[in-house]
Design a protein with these regions (language model features):
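N-terminal beta1-alpha1-beta2 module of alpha/beta enzyme domains
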Residues: 1-71, 75-78
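Flexible, glycine-rich active-site loops centered on histidine and acidic residues
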Residues: 2-23, 85-155
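Residue-level detector of alpha-helix boundaries and kinks
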Residues: 49-52, 83, 125
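Catalytic metal-binding/acid-base residues of hydrolase active sites
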Residues: 51, 81, 113-115
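Active-site nucleophile and cofactor-binding loops and adjacent substrate-binding regions
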Residues: 78-86
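Active-site glycine-rich loop that binds ribose-phosphate moieties when present
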Residues: 157-162
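Conserved small/polar residues in nucleotide/adenosyl-binding loops
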Residues: 164-166
Length: 167
């Protein structure tokens, strides 16, 4: 059994005090919670990806990179990486960099995302979100495992012998 602590980083008033932290203070609180989770023996800390209010978790690789710099053991989870919304090449670059900086502590969870606000923001339809996710995952996985990738798909420009190599 593994024990994880996961957050979507809501940015709302505290239910007890009624106080809403500044964005910077809320991010500091998330990092402090991850540090405490490591001290308490949790196996992993996850940051979800959301692109709408009341969440401020639109950049999990950035948040997880800061957590990686402040911790040494805890596994770093995405909860989830929404490849239906993201360019898989850019996602690969961000997460491969994070995995290297963290000493290999990254654990990726891939999902299609949810919510109409996110789909609207990235011009993804309910009809294409699953196909986008599958195609994005296929390219992402190839970039992670192969040194040279040539790619042609439906939802992003072709890659002609991509030599991206971070992993």
């Amino acid at each position: 059994v593994k024990f994880l602590l996961i957050t979507l980083i809501t940015h709302t008033e505290d239910p007890v005090t009624g106080v809403r932290l500044s964005t910077a203070d809320r991010f500091r609180e998330v990092v402090a919670t991850a540090e405490l989770a490591e001290e308490l023996g949790f196996d992993g800390y996850g940051v979800g990806e959301r692109h709408e209010r009341p969440f401020i978790s639109s950049a999990p690789p950035v948040v997880l990179s800061h957590i990686a710099a402040r911790t040494s053991r805890i596994r770093l989870f995405t909860a989830v990486t929404t490849l239906s919304l993201l360019d898989p090449v850019r996602a690969f670059e961000d997460y491969a960099t994070l995995d290297n900086l963290s000493g290999g502590r990254l654990e990726l969870i891939i999902g299609k995302g949810n919510g109409s606000a996110q789909r609207d923001l990235f011009e993804v339809t309910t009809e294409t979100q699953w196909a986008r996710n599958a195609e994005g995952y296929e390219l992402f996985r190839r970039l992670w495992r192969e040194d040279r990738v040539t790619w042609s798909g439906r939802f992003r420009p072709a890659l002609v012998l991509s030599l991206i190599h971070i992993s």
